[in-house]
Amino acid sequence: MGLKAVHFGAGNIGRGFVAEFLHKSGYEVVFCDVMDSIIQKLQTTPSYKVIQVGAEGTSEDTITNYRAINSKTHEADVIEEIRTADVVTCSVGPNILKFIAPVIAKGIDGRSNDATPIAVIACENAIGATDTLANHIKGDHTPQERLDDHHQRARYANSAIDRIVPAQDPDAGLDVKLEKFYEWVVDRTPFSDHEPPAIQGIKWVDDLIPYIERKLFTVNTGHAAAAYHGYYHQKATVYDALQDPNILKEVHAALEETSRLIVGKHGIEAQEQKDYVDKIITRIGNPHLEDAVERVGRAPLRKLSRKERFIAPAAELAEEGKDFTALLDAAEMAFRFQNVEGDEESKELAKIMSENSAEQVVEKVCGLQSDHPLFPHVVAVVKKVQADE
């Protein structure tokens, strides 16, 4: 039997990032999704292209050796695939993990204890996403008496992924355009008694937290800050936003604040972090990505939440008595991202802002309590935005 990976979420990250490396590593990829249209396309198209764009030009890979299953209508088939697979990966969005957990749990439960445990790796933009998935699988969907030897059937490894996938050409079909740069870091510790799965592109580490926080508080903070400042100043793309010296200065300032936190907390060298920041600003300002500010800014409620790219680092800096002004400025711009066409959360944000006091907004949206040192500062920002409306 050849190697097989089951991947949930046949969107751009799934097809363009995860499946590309699985394919290059010799895996047959079985895509699972609930979108009829994408499943039908994959079932009737024997190959698609992954196009990497960088400052130095474009390259492409052809992806073959995959199948596709509608997990809504063919659950039994998905369970059978997981029962005989080597790896399960997913890129469905952090809020969807609970919905894919039941079918994965059934697949794992049907596995032999004598086979190598299946490796489960969630590839989501969230800290500890595989843990979240594992908790749903083990906590909600695995019989109590099957938990003791569950580790003989499955191992769960958290991961940090970093690759910018812009909005795609509507006529591209299954082809995916993304940036050349990537980072895929996965926790090695669950595989202490056997080799982790051989997947090209993965960097295996014993401590993932520095990588996750560095990525979230640099790439995600910088990307979103550029988008929200850009949207407020009526720029079309992140590239356009970063051509404005004032916006560029704001993004740099926010990343100087998060860099102070990252260097102090994780012992990363200051110069190494500075080089990382410079590389990130070049990446998010890649003119070939044509990334609309509305797309990068979408889901402002999630992006303003407690563990996310602005409030999490600002809260830690406030606790340490350090400067967080630029992060607060970026958060202000996120609060102004309201009633944006095609983005439900921006409409919900507008409703919350109009129906609540500033204090209630900060508790509700940012998850901050009134005794936190950051709380009054965010309240002041919300009051300012509310006054302008």
Curated annotation (Swiss-Prot):
One function term, GO molecular function aspect: mannitol-1-phosphate 5-dehydrogenase activity
Single GO biological process annotation from the record: mannitol catabolic process
Stored Gene3D superfamilies: N-(1-d-carboxylethyl)-l-norvaline Dehydrogenase, domain 2, NAD(P)-binding Rossmann-like Domain
Keyword field: NAD, Oxidoreductase
Record-level GO cellular component terms: cytosol
SUPFAM superfamilies noted in UniProt: 6-phosphogluconate dehydrogenase C-terminal domain-like (SSF48179), NAD(P)-binding Rossmann-fold domains (SSF51735)
InterPro entries in the cross-refs: 6-PGluconate_DH-like_C_sf, 6PGD_dom2, Mannitol_1_phos_5_DH, Mannitol_DH, Mannitol_DH_C, Mannitol_DH_N, NAD(P)-bd_dom_sf
Binding site for NAD(+): 5-16
Pfam families, per the entry: Mannitol_dh (PF01232), Mannitol_dh_C (PF08125)
Keyword Transmembrane helix: no
Catalysis performed (reactions): D-mannitol 1-phosphate + NAD(+) = beta-D-fructose 6-phosphate + NADH + H(+)
NCBIfam families to which the protein is assigned, alphabetical: PRK02318.2-5
Protein family membership: Belongs to the mannitol dehydrogenase family.
Function summary: Catalyzes the NAD(H)-dependent interconversion of D-fructose 6-phosphate and D-mannitol 1-phosphate in the mannitol metabolic pathway.
Description of how the protein assembles with itself and partners: Monomer.
HAMAP family, A to Z: Mannitol_dehydrog (MF_00196)
Protein name, per record: Mannitol-1-phosphate 5-dehydrogenase
